[in-house]
C-alpha cells in the first residue's frame, strides 16, 4: 500500500470515530467532519515523519507556560509520540475554528472521548506507519526559510493547506467575502492571500508562518518581516538587481528587488510610467513588491490613491498622539466613567478634547448603543489611540472601579478575554496581566472553581488565541 493510500484509509477510520463519538453534533456538516479527520491524520503523519511542525507547539508552550501544552495535565506526556492531550488540543482548535460566537471548553467530554479512541488507533499504528519522505525533504531544504521565493511558497502552504491552518484559511475566506466583487476582485484577492501568508498569526501558538517554519526546520536564525501598508512610489531608477523608488508621501528612497516586479508589467516601463501604487514586504533586510500594482497614469486615479494613504497615515499619527495625551493626563492607566456628563468632562476637561458641533449627541448615541447602563472604561495604546471598553465593566476588578461586582464577574469576565467585539487586544492583555479578571471561568462539569483555575492558568494563551486575528 502506498503512503497516500495508507493515510487515506487511516483518515477514514478517524472519521468513523468522530461520527461515533458525537463530534458531528458540533461539526454539523459532512465536509467539516472529513476535514477534521484529514487534519488529525495529517498530525499523526507529521509525528511519524520527524515531528517537525507539532514540535513547535511543544517548544513555544514550554517557553511561555513551562509545560509542553496549554490547558492539559502533561505529567504523563511523551513528545514525538501519540498523546491524547495533543489530539484533544488539535481537535479543540478545529472545532473552535468553526465558532466565532461560542467558546468551546478544551476539557469538553466529547472531545476527550474522541481523542482517547483516536489516540488508541494511532498508538496501534505508530511503530509501523510509513514516514512521508516528501514532507521531510521539503522541510529539510536548507533554503526554505532564507530564500524569499521558497519561503513565500512555504508560507502560503502553511497558512492555507497545512493541518494547522484552519483558522487562518477561514479568516482569509471571510476577508474575500467582505470585498466588493468587481473587475479588480481577483487582483485584490491575490495580494490579500500573499500578505496573509506573511502576517497571519491565526495558528495554535500565534506565530507567523515564517516563525513557525523556522522553528520547525530547526534553523537558528532571525526572521525579519516588515509588513508595509500599501503605498505610492515614484520610480527613480531601474537596475538589474533593484528598483530605486521614492515614497510619494514621506520622500524616503527605497530599494526594491527587481525580480519581485511582474515581468509583463516591466514592459510597460517603456511607456513612461513613473508612479506606482503597491504593497511592499520586507524580508530579511530586503524589500519585495508583493501582489498586484496600480500604475494608472490618470491624475484622478493617482489623487484617489494618495488620499487614501494620507488618511491612513493621519489616523496612525492621531493614534500615537492620543496615546501620549492619555498617558500624560488621564491620571491612571485605566479610567472608569459612567454617564454622558462624566464621559464628556473626562474628554474635554482632562484630556483637552475640543468640543465640536454635535460632539455631545455623538457621545450620547455611542453610550446608548454600546454601553451597559452608561458604564465605560477608557485606556489607550500607541497603535489605536483612545480605547473604550463598553461592556462587562462590573467584571473588571480594579482598585478604581466602583462598579466591580463579583457575582456578575463570575458570569461575564470571560467575555473580556475572548470577545474582540467588546475591547481591543491591548486592553484585554492589560486586564489579564494586571490580574483584573480573576473571576473569569469556563463552565465546567467539575464546578466553578475548576473552570476558573483552567482559565486563570491559561489566561494569556486564551487572549492571544482568541484575539490573534485582531492583532495581525
Region locations from a protein language model:
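Surface-exposed loop/turn elements that mediate protein-protein interactions on large endomembrane-trafficking
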Residues: 248-250
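Mixed-charge, low-complexity intrinsically disordered regions
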Residues: 1-231, 282-472
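Short nucleic-acid-contacting surface segments enriched for D/E, G, S/T with interspersed K/R
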Residues: 259-279
Amino acid at each position: 500500500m502506498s503512503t497516500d493510500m495508507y493515510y487515506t484509509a487511516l483518515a477514514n477510520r478517524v472519521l468513523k470515530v468522530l461520527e461515533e463519538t458525537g463530534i458531528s453534533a458540533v461539526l454539523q456538516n459532512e465536509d467539516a467532519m472529513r476535514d477534521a479527520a484529514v487534519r488529525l491524520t495529517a498530525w499523526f503523519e507529521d509525528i511519524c515523519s520527524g515531528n517537525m511542525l507539532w514540535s513547535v507547539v511543544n517548544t513555544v508552550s514550554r517557553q511561555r507556560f513551562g509545560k509542553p501544552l496549554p490547558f492539559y495535565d502533561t505529567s504523563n506526556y511523551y513528545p514525538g509520540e501519540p498523546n491524547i492531550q495533543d489530539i484533544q488540543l488539535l481537535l479543540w482548535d478545529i472545532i473552535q475554528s468553526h465558532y466565532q460566537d461560542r467558546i468551546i471548553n478544551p476539557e469538553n467530554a466529547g472531545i476527550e472521548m474522541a481523542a482517547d479512541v483516536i489516540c488508541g488507533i494511532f498508538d496501534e499504528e505508530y511503530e509501523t506507519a510509513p514516514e512521508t519522505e516528501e514532507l521531510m525533504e521539503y522541510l529539510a531544504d536548507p533554503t526554505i526559510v532564507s530564500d524569499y521565493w521558497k519561503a513565500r511558497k512555504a508560507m502560503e502552504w502553511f497558512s492555507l493547506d497545512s493541518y494547522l491552518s484552519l483558522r487562518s484559511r477561514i479568516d482569509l475566506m471571510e476577508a474575500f467575502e467582505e470585498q466588493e466583487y468587481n473587475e479588480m476582485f481577483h487582483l485584490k484577492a491575490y495580494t490579500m492571500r500573499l500578505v496573509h501568508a506573511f502576517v497571519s498569526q491565526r495558528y495554535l501558538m500565534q506565530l507567523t508562518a515564517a516563525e513557525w517554519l523556522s522553528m520547525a526546520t530547526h534553523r537558528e536564525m532571525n526572521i525579519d518581516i516588515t509588513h508595509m501598508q500599501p503605498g505610492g512610489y515614484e520610480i527613480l531608477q531601474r537596475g538589474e538587481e533593484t528598483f530605486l523608488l521614492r515614497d510619494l508621501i514621506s520622500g524616503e528612497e527605497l530599494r526594491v528587488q527587481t525580480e519581485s516586479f511582474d515581468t509583463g508589467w516591466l514592459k510597460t516601463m517603456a511607456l513612461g510610467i513613473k508612479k506606482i501604487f503597491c504593497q511592499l514586504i520586507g524580508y530579511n533586510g530586503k524589500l519585495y513588491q508583493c501582489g498586484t500594482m496600480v500604475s494608472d497614469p490618470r491624475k484622478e486615479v493617482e489623487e484617489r490613491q494618495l488620499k487614501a494613504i494620507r488618511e491612513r497615515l493621519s489616523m496612525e499619527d492621531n493614534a500615537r498622539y492620543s496615546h501620549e495625551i492619555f498617558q500624560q493626563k488621564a491620571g491612571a492607566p485605566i479610567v472608569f466613567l459612567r454617564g454622558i456628563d462624566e464621559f464628556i468632562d473626562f474628554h474635554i476637561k482632562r484630556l483637552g478634547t475640543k468640543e465640536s458641533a454635535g460632539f455631545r449627541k455623538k457621545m450620547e448615541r455611542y453610550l446608548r448603543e454600546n454601553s451597559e447602563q452608561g458604564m465605560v472604561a477608557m485606556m489607550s495604546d500607541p497603535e489605536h489611540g483612545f480605547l473604550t471598553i463598553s461592556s462587562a465593566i462590573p467584571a473588571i476588578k480594579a482598585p478604581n472601579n466602583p462598579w466591580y461586582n463579583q457575582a456578575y464577574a463570575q458570569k461575564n469576565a470571560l467575555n473580556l478575554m475572548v470577545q474582540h467585539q467588546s475591547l481591543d487586544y491591548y486592553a484585554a492583555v492589560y486586564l489579564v496581566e494586571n490580574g483584573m479578571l480573576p473571576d473569569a471561568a469556563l463552565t465546567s462539569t467539575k464546578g466553578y472553581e475548576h473552570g476558573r483555575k483552567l482559565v486563570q492558568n491559561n489566561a494569556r494563551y486564551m487572549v492571544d488565541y482568541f484575539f490573534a486575528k485582531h492583532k495581525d
